[in-house]
């Protein structure tokens, strides 16, 4: 999603900084560049990079808080949608089934779809936060769910 449909780095950084401050974790502010450097990685890897000094349990707790508050923030404020995304998706939808697969936390895709009201264009979604599988594994998972039916035995 990030870098393809929208750019949420500034909004994610702002949201995470608020959460980190409330949680009392002492670190320099998370910059847009910090967020851009971890976009596309799975959430566990992002947490290890951004919160290296925390014990694993505390890191996961803070990561969960950041993800929840980020989702709510994005659902309310959105981010920078790339030009003509709705129109492009509508055109693609005429010929193709559209899915979103991401290495994000649960709820991130839904926050995007909610804010931009794009649910009608997407048939299914999957993400790391739902099942701890990478984007590649989740693409394979969605692909395995496809079923082709035909009245002709030759098909």
Where do the PLM segments sit?
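Substrate-recognition element of Asp-dependent hydrolases with the DxDx(T/V) motif
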Residues: 88-113, 128
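Conserved small/polar residues in nucleotide/adenosyl-binding loops
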Residues: 148-155
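A short, structured active-site edge motif that brings together acidic residues
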Residues: 35, 119-133
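Metal-dependent phosphoesterase signature
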Residues: 48-84
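Active-site neighborhood of HAD-like aspartate-dependent phosphohydrolases
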Residues: 1-33
């Amino acid at each position: 999603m990030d870098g393809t449909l929208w750019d949420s780095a500034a909004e994610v950084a702002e949201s995470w900084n608020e959460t980190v401050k409330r949680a009392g974790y002492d670190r320099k502010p998370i910059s847009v560049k910090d967020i851009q450097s971890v976009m596309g990685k799975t959430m566990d890897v992002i947490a290890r990079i951004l919160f290296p000094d925390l014990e694993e349990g505390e890191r996961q707790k803070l990561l969960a808080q950041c993800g929840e508050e980020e989702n709510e923030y994005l659902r309310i404020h959105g981010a920078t949608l790339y030009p003509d995304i709705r129109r492009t998706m509508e055109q693609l939808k005429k010929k193709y089934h559209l899915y979103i697969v991401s290495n994000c936390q649960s709820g991130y895709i839904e926050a995007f779809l909610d804010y931009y009201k794009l649910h009608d264009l997407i048939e299914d979604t999957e993400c790391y936060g739902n099942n701890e599988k990478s984007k590649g594994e989740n693409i394979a998972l969605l692909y395995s769910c496809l079923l082709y039916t035909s009245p002709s035995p030759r098909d």
